[in-house]
Amino acid sequence: NIKLNFDGIYLIMFITFEGIEGSGKSTQVKLLKAALEKIHFDVESTREPGWGRVGSLIRKIILDYDDIEIEPITELSLFCADRAQHVQEFIKPKLSQGKIVLCDRFYDSTIAYQGYGRGLDPEMVKKLGFGAALGIIPTVTFLIDISVNTALSRIIERPGRNRIDDESFEFHSRVRKSYLSLHNKQPNRICLIDGEKDIDSVQSEIRRTLRNRFSIFKRLDKLG
């Protein structure tokens, strides 16, 4: 498998996926991982929250325990604790080995959900979120954008809804608005993808963006 090693120095290729609930991020991570492995890249995929034993416990507290009330600041702290553990134990080591890492959510989610969705001070959220990332910055972020109406219609159809899935229309609207604002402020890193399209079209747009921006991904052309 191909590792990103040039003259003994490993390049960082950390690709994150963002979007409101029901945007199809997880599906796109799986499809891109399979495509990159098909052309012999060494790829790892992961998610937040929920990597590893600590992350799994934190995910269960945050998402599944609908019978307990979690204060927004507590929720933020749990997400940041999950990220610090995740970065230190998984993301940093994999990147240092020259592997491509695909991550379903990273610190942009914290800004959107806890900063704007929950109404916490955005500057405080940014500082804590970035601090928990331990200096790791995504190489590129794919923001898969869908309307809140589309999101809610997809959420209703899927099994195992969680506490955040069941938030109000207004909550999801604030989160989406925050994501679009982040894209407008950082268009070079955060690539806006139309998630209203079918799954294959979304994946094609993601691959096209990677081919156009990074020469190492030119071989994605072979996959169509």
Positions of predicted regions on the chain:
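ATP-dependent small-molecule kinase phosphotransfer cores
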Residues: 41-133, 205
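Hydrophobic positions on the alpha1 helix immediately C-terminal to the Walker A/P-loop
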Residues: 28
